[in-house]
Design a protein with these regions (language model features):
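N-terminal helix-rich structural modules
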Residues: 2-168, 172
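Contiguous, non-catalytic segments that form substrate-binding/exosite surfaces or channel walls
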Residues: 138-141, 145-274
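General structural signal for secondary-structure boundaries
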Residues: 1-2, 106-107, 225-226, 232
């Protein structure tokens, strides 16, 4: 099924095993990691839905093992490192708006549509029964996955003995049900002493190549390397000096980096989604 000239590209990725030393983790943190990984898999599930228009169907049972691996790595039949060209025969070029917008929607139609949240990071654009455009918030469109993820984050929060992490997990759990992420983002920035970390939810907007309005779901489950993080601490004090020496006009250097900025090193134990 993969085009003959694309077969060589199935060899461009090398598998890497993600590992970390968990011997120094508390028993509570060891229990939390599998829960966070389970939550992350739901972000993967959503990203598949965001990436692939419903009108494009692929019979994955017809793919060889090598083809299926390449398909899985790319989250669909388009080669992400080759201009999103289709690598499966008979599949058209990927729509610029992925699955965030109807594939038959024109820019003129979208721009003429008077809808306040159409540019929101957290809405899917669909058509009503009468063919007119409607927006559906992520917390409704992905209600099943968001609810499950929220429950898992709350479960992890109950186990955690780190008050900052507990607070962040609970706020992120609530955010997934409301699509209001600011408070949990601030709580994440405020964490200082946590060993376990998770980035989760709709964050980057690169998947929407039509407008760049829509966020894609992703997750990283992380374990902080405290030894290396301590080594990086000394560089925080250099940030103002480094900024002052940037080769740009003074107006671009007016905002000084805070002395409470953090530089940390992490081992990634799980990636999911965008």
């Amino acid at each position: 099924i993969i085009k003959e000239n694309e077969m060589a590209r199935t060899e461009i990725y090398a598998p890497v095993k993600l590992t970390t030393d968990i011997s120094k983790l508390s028993e509570e943190d060891k229990k939390i990691i599998p829960i966070l990984i389970e939550a992350a898999t739901l972000m993967d599930e959503i990203f598949w839905l965001e990436s692939n228009p419903e009108s494009i169907m692929i019979d994955i049972e017809q793919l060889s093992k090598k083809e299926n691996t390449f398909y899985t790595i790319n989250y669909g039949p388009w080669d992400r490192l080759n201009g999103n060209d289709a690598f499966i025969s008979g599949v058209a070029k990927k729509p610029l708006g992925a699955n965030y917008y109807p594939t038959d929607m024109t820019k003129q139609e979208f721009e003429a549509w008077d809808q306040g949240d159409k540019k929101s990071l957290y809405t899917m654009i669909r058509r009503n029964d009468d063919g007119t455009l409607i927006s559906i918030h992520f917390n409704a469109f992905f209600k099943t996955q968001h609810t499950k993820t929220s429950d898992l984050l709350k479960k992890a929060a109950e186990i955690s003995t780190d008050e900052e992490l507990k607070n962040y997990l609970n706020l992120r759990a609530a955010a997934l049900l409301t699509d209001n992420y600011d408070e949990s983002d601030i709580a994440w920035l405020d964490m200082k002493n946590n060993t376990i970390d998770i980035i989760i939810g709709p964050i980057e907007n690169y998947e929407d190549k039509l407008y760049g309005y829509k966020a894609a779901h992703e997750s990283y489950v992380l374990v902080k390397d405290k030894e290396w993080s301590q080594r990086l601490e000394k560089y925080v004090s250099y940030l103002p000096e480094l900024q002052n020496n940037l080769p740009v006009e003074p107006k671009y250097k007016a905002e000084q980096p805070g002395r409470d900025a953090q530089l940390n090193a992490y081992d990634v134990v799980y990636y999911a989604g965008d």
